[in-house]
């Protein structure tokens, strides 16, 4: 693979936009990375990142493209909330303080998934992106993401890889 288009970079480009959208812009990053595999590649294949968002939220993101098990998990804690997600549309839970337990959060009425991919890869987001693009071209919708936002995310990815 090419360093400019490596698997880790691709994962950052998928994960960082929605994390920024949900938790706010990135204020600071602390990154640990290395080439952990014996693969003959010219880039690191394991990253552990501590992210501080402008909102004050702290989070960690691990990107590992060599593990035999593909994983995508998220836990978010705050004084007033707790969210757990195991990467697939049916595994998002939020803590209900009144019920003192977790309840499922429904993301989609129907999930589009290709069997060849891991369970956490669903096609719904790609479809929604295309609908928004066509609506924007036709003047019926505003773009959900801008080139300026892309440029900012790419700038953070460059800093992560530095």
Kindly give the residue locations of the regions a language model identified.
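Acidic/polar loop patches that form or flank catalytic/metal-binding clefts of enzymes
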Residues: 25-31, 58-59, 83-84, 143-144
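Predominantly a Rossmann-like dinucleotide-binding segment in NAD(P)-dependent oxidoreductases
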Residues: 1-40
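C-terminal helix-rich "cap/oligomerization" subdomain common to oxidoreductases
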Residues: 125-162
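NAD(P)-dinucleotide binding in Rossmann-like oxidoreductases
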Residues: 38-44, 54-128
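Active-site rim elements
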Residues: 4-6, 117-121, 139-143
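A structural signal for well-ordered alpha-helical scaffolds and beta->alpha junctions
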Residues: 12-19, 85, 123-130, 150
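Short phosphate-engaging motifs
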Residues: 15, 68, 153
